[in-house]
């Protein structure tokens, strides 16, 4: 009942997610004494985002028997499951500054956004399905093995303070994996933290963190009007349509964060809305996912109001399956 009330209260406190895990903490001693062990690996990487994928490719190319473990059902992390709409700048303003695998993946991904100029290096749109296929191909061609829908659950340490095994939860139950080298590419530092590495949460003594966002996409927009009409959002420019929607007071879940990119014919992808979330609390993250989807719907309603020429026939085609966590 308390959890349902907390979800219902979110509309009254937009963007603020309270931690509820403290009320639920009780102990249970596991009776299971043995689980299966897979100990054939040279390198085990936890997390299949850009860092995990490139680490897996590099290790496998050097001949290491490599396993890439990913909690979701796709590689790419925030660029695919998280639906971040564009690459951050790849240049110093004149020339590309990221080489090797990063440049190769970036160049390949541009084939999935044919409307982008070939020489563009900064804020290039991402087609998440196309990018996903690139990671699948490059990782598997390198010889690395991929295990999807498998989440790190625990870390077993040896007496000399090194990792003895990692425990993963998936459809087979709890499974232990052993390797000679372990790489933490979780994005949250889970493997390192659960191995006993020290860490600091947040950017101040109170543990404050940057706000999170849930990305989403709109389909059936008017691309011509989107490209040639007024810019939807410019930071601190209150003449842009988004500020008009916020000032109206009709859309309490909409704030002045609305980065957006055309990712295909009549489809834009948006990094929009802010939520203050304890990103170490699974209950808070769960509530943020619900609130993020509500925000996506309300952003569309707001855009239909202030920019009907672009959005009158649009609909929410997808919301991300991974929360955009900045801290």
Model regions: which residues?
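N-terminal export signals
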Residues: 1-19
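C-terminal segment of N-terminal export signals and the immediately downstream linker at the start
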Residues: 14-43
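Soluble non-cytosolic domains of exported or imported proteins
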Residues: 50, 125-130, 286, 290-293
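Ligand-binding pocket scaffold of soluble enzyme catalytic domains
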Residues: 51, 80, 172-175
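Loop/turn elements at helix/coil->beta-strand transitions in domains of secreted/extracellular proteins
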Residues: 40-42, 62-65, 142-145, 175, ...
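Conserved N-terminal/central alpha/beta ligand/cofactor-binding core
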Residues: 4-7, 58, 64-65, 70-156, ...
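N-terminal Rossmann-like FAD-binding beta1-loop-alpha1 element of flavoenzymes
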Residues: 43-64
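Flavin (FAD/FMN)-binding glycine-rich loop and adjacent Rossmann-like elements that form
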Residues: 30, 34, 105, 149, ...
């Amino acid at each position: 009942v308390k959890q349902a009330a907390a979800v219902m209260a979110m509309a009254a406190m937009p963007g603020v997610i309270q931690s509820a895990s403290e009320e639920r903490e009780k102990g249970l001693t596991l009776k299971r004494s043995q689980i299966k062990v897979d100990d054939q690996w040279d390198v085990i990487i936890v997390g299949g985002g850009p860092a995990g994928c490139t680490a897996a490719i590099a290790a496998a190319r050097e001949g290491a028997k490599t396993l890439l473990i990913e909690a979701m059902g796709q590689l790419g992390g925030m660029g695919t499951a998280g639906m971040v709409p564009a690459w951050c700048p790849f240049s110093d303003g004149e020339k590309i500054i990221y080489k090797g695998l990063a440049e190769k993946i970036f160049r390949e991904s541009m084939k999935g956004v044919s409307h982008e100029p070939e020489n563009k290096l900064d804020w290039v749109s991402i087609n998440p399905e196309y990018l996903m296929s690139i990671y699948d191909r490059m990782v598997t061609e390198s010889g690395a093995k991929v295990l999807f829908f498998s989440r790190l659950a625990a870390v077993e340490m040896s007496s000399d303070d090194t990792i003895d095994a990692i425990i993963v939860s998936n459809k087979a139950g709890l499974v232990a994996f052993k390797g000679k080298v372990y790489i933490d590419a979780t994005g949250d530092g889970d493997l390192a933290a659960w191995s006993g590495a020290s860490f600091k949460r947040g950017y101040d003594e109170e543990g404050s963190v940057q706000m999170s966002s849930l990305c989403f996409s709109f389909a059936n927009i008017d691309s011509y009007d989107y490209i040639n009409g007024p810019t939807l959002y410019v930071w601190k420019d209150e003449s842009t349509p988004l500020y008009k929607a916020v000032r109206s007071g009709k859309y309490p879940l909409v704030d002045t964060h609305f980065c957006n990119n055309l990712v295909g014919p009549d489809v834009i992808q948006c990094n929009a809305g802010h939520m203050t979330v304890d990103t170490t609390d699974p209950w808070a993250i769960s509530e943020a996912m619900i609130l993020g989807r509500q925000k996506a719907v309300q952003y569309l309603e707001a855009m239909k109001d202030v920019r009907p020429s672009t959005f009158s026939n649009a609909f929410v085609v997808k919301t991300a399956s991974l929360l955009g966590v900045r801290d």
